[in-house]
Amino acid sequence: MGCTRDAILDALENLTADELKKFKMKLLSVPLREGYGRIPRGTLLPLDAVDLTDKLVSYYLEAYGAELTALVLRDMGMQEVAEQLQETMSKGPRNVLAEVRDPLQKTAKPGLHFVDQHRAALIARVTVVDGVLDALYGKVLTEEQYQAVRAERTSSDKMRKLFSFSPAWNMTCKDLLLQALRDTQPYLVDDLEQS
């Protein structure tokens, strides 16, 4: 899905310096979906189009990052650029924006992912979270997300904070979490798989 990143970058590179500044200011106040954190103002404001694209994708992943970019562009009155972005998305191998608009379609299927199915038990029973975080750092978690989870005091609070980022994850991210849990807490994972 690298085409999504390219589409976001194309849209942002079409903005003038003033429009890019306005985009960043609007991005600071646009309502976000539950589970998504806001990019800090100090981090956001100095970014150019390339770095901003990277930051959008790392914070919101490609699908929601593209939707958010289109939303902010529309809010700025730049319908044409927003439509070009959405058009590029719908021409991709699969319609990324439609996938973002209907995320419940996947979770409504009977085969919930292990980490979704056992969320409550994982929050309550995972005792060593740091090893899990280290495995996810850079692949699933950004530096800010990693530090936010580490800042929590108890293991259950750390797991709860970790799960607060999960609405932005795809199956690969959840598979990486499961693998990290298998590596650090194999007996717990075995017990939950048998329950």
From Swiss-Prot:
CDD domains: CARD_ASC_NALP1, Pyrin_ASC-like
Protein name in the entry: Apoptosis-associated speck-like protein containing a CARD
GO cellular component assignments: AIM2 inflammasome complex; cytoplasm; endoplasmic reticulum; mitochondrion; NLRP3 inflammasome complex; NLRP6 inflammasome complex; nucleus
Gene: PYCARD
Domain-related comment: The CARD domain mediates interaction with CASP1 and NLRC4. The pyrin domain mediates homotypic interactions with pyrin domains of proteins such as of NLRP3, PYDC1, PYDC2 and AIM2.
Keywords per UniProt: Apoptosis, Cytoplasm, Endoplasmic reticulum, Immunity, Inflammasome, Inflammatory response, Innate immunity, Isopeptide bond, Mitochondrion, Nucleus, Phosphoprotein, Tumor suppressor, Ubl conjugation
Domain annotation Pyrin: ranges: 1-91
Start and end residues of each CARD domain: 107-195
PROSITE patterns given in the database record: CARD, DAPIN
The record's account of how the chain is modified after translation: Phosphorylated. 'Lys-63'-linked polyubiquitination by TRAF3 is critical for speck formation and inflammasome activation. 'Lys-63'-linked deubiquitinated by USP50; a crucial step for NLRP3-mediated inflammasome activation. 'Lys-63'-linked polyubiquitination by PELI1 is also critical for speck formation and inflammasome activation. Deubiquitinated by USP3 that cleaves 'Lys-48'-linked ubiquitin chains and strengthens its stability by blocking proteasomal degradation.
Tree of life domain: Eukaryota
SMART domains: PYRIN (SM01289)
UniProt subunit comment: Self-associates; enforced oligomerization induces apoptosis, NF-kappa-B regulation and interleukin-1 beta secretion. Homooligomers can form disk-like particles of approximately 12 nm diameter and approximately 1 nm height. Component of several inflammasomes containing one pattern recognition receptor/sensor, such as NLRP1, NLRP2, NLRP3, NLRP6, NLRC4, AIM2, MEFV or NOD2, and probably NLRC4 or NLRP12. Major component of the ASC pyroptosome, a 1-2 um supramolecular assembly (one per macrophage cell) which consists of oligomerized PYCARD dimers and CASP1.
Subcellular location(s) of the protein: Cytoplasm; Inflammasome; Endoplasmic reticulum; Mitochondrion
Cross-link (Glycyl lysine isopeptide (Lys-Gly) (interchain with G-Cter in ubiquitin)): K55, K174
A biological-process GO annotation: activation of innate immune response
Function field: Functions as a key mediator in apoptosis and inflammation. Promotes caspase-mediated apoptosis involving predominantly caspase-8 and also caspase-9 in a probable cell type-specific manner. Involved in activation of the mitochondrial apoptotic pathway, promotes caspase-8-dependent proteolytic maturation of BID independently of FADD in certain cell types and also mediates mitochondrial translocation of BAX and activates BAX-dependent apoptosis coupled to activation of caspase-9, -2 and -3.
First-listed, main subcellular location of the protein, grouped into a coarse class: cytoplasm
